[in-house]
Regions:
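Secreted/periplasmic carbohydrate-active enzymes, especially glycoside hydrolases
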Residues: 1-319
């Protein structure tokens, strides 16, 4: 009998609109012991993936969750099932809608693995040199990020209310899965700083963060050389810090963060970027309102140089 141990389950968001969208669950074929498949695919060897998705759930609003079963998609690379969700709700800070996905793997009708996952529909994306949010009806609005480096646990102490009221994004270095879960449920948006010692751990961290609705984007820092192909199929914007504006940006970067002190020498650099540019500064602040004000001051101070995709207030300078 073919054995399988803790197969990785991938959840995929299909194209969406306000009427319906599809969600796919997939078990990677590399998780099966190929020598036990006797040249067959996992599906031909009588493995199946099934389950259901329920939701939306939201702590800030009353919802009427629906339950939709996943339908097997037949033979192919790995195991794949799909469910069509009516009236999908995208995750936002104001309305942090989540879905529960229950998945089970069976062999010859016998359950071999069972797991539950949190799923969210993303409503933000990059277009040209800005971030945008959609209402799922095909309407997009430009979203200027106003980010502050702040302890996430403190931001969540009041259920994220102050961060939501001020429209702030919380900059967090290597957030834990528990923190991401709480931020997703409570509506606190995170800009994650990914700082890992090697390529493998960096890519793994980005992929783990990409499943959380609260993580709007990741910024990779440190001396790791990543190929653009390493981040294929990652459903989240990935950017970099710019230490030297005279150097080329990595091919994988979809946006960048530039220190305000470099702007006077970076006009040509900024004008030449076909991607969002976020300006950062190091300033103290006492609370969320003061942090939001610091973002406004930074925006005003650099208005002559350009209209940027976002403004970050840091408490330390993370390279």
């Amino acid at each position: 009998m073919t054995e399988v141990t803790n197969l990785e389950i991938e959840m995929i968001q299909g194209p969406f609109n306000s009427i319906s969208t599809q969600v796919f669950v997939r078990a990677n074929p590399t998780g099966f012991a190929e020598d036990n498949l006797a040249g067959q695919s996992a599906w031909q060897a009588d493995w199946r993936i099934a389950g259901q998705i329920s939701g939306p759930y939201c702590v800030h609003s009353e919802t009427l969750p629906a339950v939709i079963a996943f339908q097997d998609q037949g033979d192919g690379a790995g195991l794949l099932a799909a469910a069509r969700i009516p009236d999908p709700c995208a995750w936002t800070a104001r309305l942090p809608a989540t879905y529960k996905v229950d998945v089970e793997l069976t062999h010859a009708g016998q359950r071999r693995q069972q797991s539950q996952h949190l799923f969210t529909f993303r409503a933000n994306e990059i277009r040209q040199n800005s971030f945008y949010q959609t209402d799922l009806n095909g309407n997009y609005r430009r979203w200027v990020l106003r980010c502050v480096q702040h302890p996430l646990d403190d931001a969540l102490s009041d259920g994220g209310e102050q961060f939501r009221e001020e429209g702030l994004v919380c900059i967090v270095i290597n957030p834990t899965m528990e923190q991401c879960n709480l931020a997703t449920l409570n509506g606190v948006v995170i800009l994650s700083i990914v700082q890992q010692p090697d390529i493998e751990k960096t890519i793994s961290a980005v992929k783990e963060l990409a499943v959380w609705g609260c993580v709007t984007a990741c910024v990779i820092v440190g001396d790791v050389e990543i190929k653009d192909t390493d981040l294929n199929n990652v459903r989240i914007p990935v950017g970099c810090r710019v230490a030297d504006v005279s150097e080329s940006l990595p091919a994988w970067a979809q946006f960048c963060i530039v220190d305000v002190a470099s702007l006077s020498n970076a006009s040509a650099f900024v004008d030449g970027q076909q991607m969002p540019v976020i300006v950062s500064d190091i300033q103290p602040f006492e609370d969320c309102r003061a942090a939001r004000n610091q973002c406004a001051v930074l925006q005003k101070n650099v208005a002559a140089e350009g209209d940027y995709a976002g403004y970050c207030i840091l408490t330390t300078n993370k390279d």
